[in-house]
């Protein structure tokens, strides 16, 4: 059984984790992704309950920053266009005075493997590539974009008695 009690922060990739990996593009080159609102709620709950949360993605779209800033993530903790995810993960840990083993990381593809191995708990959706499944500590029962992030953020917060909904803080 996985011990979630030492987790002090959460970090994740976007495409294939928070989304199903599908990207729509219009004629002007604007990219569109679909996110599960349950994942967004879990991110907001984590932020409201004092957990640092970070995004480390190869995607460059400013809509990612807008989406997750609105859920409470500090814009400085949103690493867009990441080509060296372990470096960005280490920066996130340093900025929050965390040891890598105190952070849960969600990833789905080869660029995520090094971070998954460094993190305290590496989680992947059930449709992640095989190499990631082999590196993961946990394989979710859910595919990317279908609340696989919520599933394990919630478990970690509940294990610590920190899955607490404050309606007043949530409305701010």
Residue ranges and their predicted role:
Residues 32-33, 71, 76-79, 86-172:
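Mg2+-dependent phosphoryl-transfer enzymes with acidic/Ser/Thr/Gly-rich catalytic loops
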